[in-house]
Amino acid sequence: MVTVEEVRNAQRAEGPATVLAIGTATPSNCVDQSTYPDYYFRITDSEHKTELKEKFKRICDKSMIKKRYMHLTEKILKENPNICESMAPSLDARTNIYAVEVPKLGKEAAEKAIEEWNQPKSRITHLVFCTTTGVSMPGADFQLTKLLGLGSSVKRFMMNQLGCFAGGTVLRLAKDLAENNKGARVLVVCSEITVVTFRGPNDTHFDSLVGQALFGDGAAAVIIGSDPIPNVERPLFELVSAAQTLLPDSKNSICGELREIGLTFHLLKDVAELISNNIEKSLVEVFQPLGISAWNSIFWVAHPGGPAILNQVELKLGLNPEKLGATRHVLSEYGNMSSASILFVLDEMRKSSTQKGFDTTGEGLKWGVLIGFGPGITFETIVLHSVSTQGSFGIRDWDYNFGIEFKIIFIPYLVLGIS
């Protein structure tokens, strides 16, 4: 008779979770940041608020954003005038748009990831869908299974209202699913549109004005699985370890509330300082087992929360300017897309590494970090292990060495409960 331990061992994958494919999508409507203040104050019938408009222009000028993509076109906004008001009841109109467009945009990203993966959709065993845009039942996860034609037995997980750190959360969940379910292939989708946060300017809600200058629309999808099939599946990154950290006494620094007027966004002035002063604690937690403490020796996949946060993190950790290059590129080209942002950065990291001639997907480096932050303040930190960019498929020659490193370095920490 078999033992429970034997059953469990048979259920688990042998190797670490890997990123097997990445896909991204945006709405077709692109807005230029340099002309956005004029458009925003015109479409919201707020051109008489000249002082506020000048403040908004300065925010946009300092945002380090060149352009963003938005589903809300001028036509849609004119058809839904309450969305343009600062405090008008408009949740019904916003929900009608969200319920259709969030799964639809997610489908575009998912199809690109599946195309890169180049495997039949029937091999997808789990679906994790994440959005901060809204809530419905059945959720966007259900809608996406129908849009993609996934099997009825796919195990679904729906995550709502987590905010900007959620791109790390879904990867942490997908890692656990892949490593504890032999043969699992997890489709992860983050889809965000600004339909619930867009509103007209208000003199008493300056933090909302900051959000209007930063947030954009986008969806990203990744396929996660352990033990990739040699010569069939090509890993892009390995997910080595993951941690979540909650910063004490910071719950009101970043927060949002879903109300009749939509999702209200609150951002305190001390957010950049709080994040930069505490980010190293999260790094030490996951990299101490590896003996890594030089933050310029790893590649960086960081959430593009905003220029002030990136500048202070760079200064506090003494990072070389190029370390946050992929993050700054995504911020410049797309803005802050909440949960989807960090997956865009992951995609940019692997693409730019190849384009620049590096020999790994992590800018020629072996180890890297994916770090997200958002409401809580919550940090999601994942240790990444890059792979070769030389075109080899499946398990690489040095995967064996990585397995030895993992057992020697990490297992004692896990057994002893050291973090």
From Swiss-Prot:
**Where does this protein come from, organism-wise?**
Petunia hybrida
Family assignment from sequence similarity: Belongs to the thiolase-like superfamily. Chalcone/stilbene synthases family.
Protein's pathway: Secondary metabolite biosynthesis; flavonoid biosynthesis
Transmembrane portions of the chain: none
> What is the protein named?
Chalcone synthase D
Task: List the GO molecular function terms.
Answer: naringenin-chalcone synthase activity
Q: Which cysteines are joined by disulfide bonds?
A: none
* InterPro entries assigned to the protein according to its UniProt record, in alphabetical order: Chalcone/stilbene_synt_C (IPR012328), Chalcone/stilbene_synt_N (IPR001099), Chalcone/stilbene_synthase_AS (IPR018088), Polyketide_synthase_type-III (IPR011141), Thiolase-like (IPR016039)
Q: Which UniProt keywords apply?
A: Acyltransferase, Flavonoid biosynthesis, Transferase
Which reaction is the catalytic activity of this chain? (E)-4-coumaroyl-CoA + 3 malonyl-CoA + 3 H(+) = 2',4,4',6'-tetrahydroxychalcone + 3 CO2 + 4 CoA
